[in-house]
């Protein structure tokens, strides 16, 4: 029996795991590298060495999260606070689980982990010591331990000596639930949370992102109840200390626009905002790698080296990687510690209060302006709407826009009613004197996408304050304040109506989009806070 750093089998017995052969506690990167490449490993446990020095793994049939298999125990702790899938008008993934079924699932996972050699990783979620979660991850798979070591904040030796976990994640990816039908569940796989026991259970899915986004969902529950904003956004800071946060759904430019040589990165995906300022939840990045090239995204490409962990990429016989191959999944990924990126905030991923809050949308309808300045109520309205749209081809070759509305630009990870996140964000913004902007990185009446050059000039104008002093006019129907001119931006594109052959053409498309906004927002009118915000949206 080898016990590391005082972690005893008795401590694991408290979680229901018995007869542990060996505990590999907070393994070093070098040890994980050896473990992942152990030639005796088979199946999804096995890692493959690539020519870039990073290990690649296969996550099996699950190459993304499994939202239909997500459950939260409904008990006295959560009954009146959680945003439940079976209550109210809004649709979400927070399906209730009975305490009895939870005990059954816990028994399956603890049985799977008992009698095994286990990897235990203690890490922090949240860069602020006052509000961070101390999380203990328990798994029998070396690369899953590597994933959480990359993605969460790695404690110092001193912090580890006094580490007391306040959340436990037990990953039993190899076990499934044969009684799922009788229990009324979605499938034999499960990702379940218990806020009373402060525990997450994983069964059947090997996808690493379940641990990352699982803890994000928990921060999204715990922090807003303390008045702290919990945000699905990227964040950066200027040399002078001016902080900006960028909200946006996939494909809107969140990573591209927050990666700015003039500014340092705080983080790329999950942040909190408390009395001290904006802080990263994570200690790493989880970047998409499909069609990755050294020329287009040198920072991410250069981060793929020893200690990075690739998922579901195609590795050729000679160890080279085919980043263009999406045959396994389009959601190929790499996790790496944040210090693999050069231009970051050090030593801790946090900064002061944000003064600029940017909502990115890619409007394929061609209606919204490239930039507008939002009022406090409009800020809440557009935050709750979380709008973007893609162009999807139809069989006749016509490209029709497909709208997406995702509350708070991250509906899949919300644990409370969306209006609670909007209220906390606006309070934080008001206290900091922050201003919000809606930036359309999508299309206009010409049918072309707004150029990255123009969008970068708009972001620069927001960040250097010139947009705050610009004269504005109001776009009808959406009541958005648009600047009359901005340095470095073609004035003609600022008013979307100018990009159409006639104002009537814009009007027609605007009515279509306004109706979509109004219909979507109806789900928030079941609370007084939501109903009061209808006036801040479009009017037909």
UniProtKB/Swiss-Prot annotation:
GO CC terms of this entry: cytosol
Pfam family, one: PEPCK_ATP
GO biological process, one term: gluconeogenesis
Matches recorded under InterPro entries: PEP_carboxykinase_ATP, PEP_carboxykinase_C, PEP_carboxykinase_N, PEPCK_ATP_CS
Binding-site residues, substrate: 65, 207, 213, 333
Keywords recorded for this protein, A-Z: Acetylation, ATP-binding, Cytoplasm, Decarboxylase, Gluconeogenesis, Lyase, Manganese, Metal-binding, Nucleotide-binding
Molecular function per GO: ATP binding; metal ion binding; phosphoenolpyruvate carboxykinase (ATP) activity
Modification N6-acetyllysine occurs at: 87, 523
EC number in record: 4.1.1.49
Predominant localisation class: cytoplasm
Binding site for ATP: 213, 232, 248-256, 297, 333, 449-450, 455
PROSITE patterns for the chain: PEPCK_ATP (PS00532)
Residues that hold Mn(2+) according to the record: 213, 232, 269
Functional pathway: Carbohydrate biosynthesis; gluconeogenesis
SUPFAM superfamilies linked to this entry: PEP carboxykinase N-terminal domain, PEP carboxykinase-like
Cofactor(s), names only, from the UniProt record: Mn(2+)
Superkingdom, taxonomy of origin: Bacteria
Cofactor binding comment, as recorded: Binds 1 Mn(2+) ion per subunit.
Cited function: Involved in the gluconeogenesis. Catalyzes the conversion of oxaloacetate (OAA) to phosphoenolpyruvate (PEP) through direct phosphoryl transfer between the nucleoside triphosphate and OAA.
NCBIfam families for this protein: pckA, PRK09344.1-1, PRK09344.1-2, PRK09344.1-3
Listed PANTHER family: PHOSPHOENOLPYRUVATE CARBOXYKINASE (ATP), PHOSPHOENOLPYRUVATE CARBOXYKINASE ATP
HAMAP family for this protein: PEPCK_ATP
Protein's name in the database: Phosphoenolpyruvate carboxykinase (ATP)
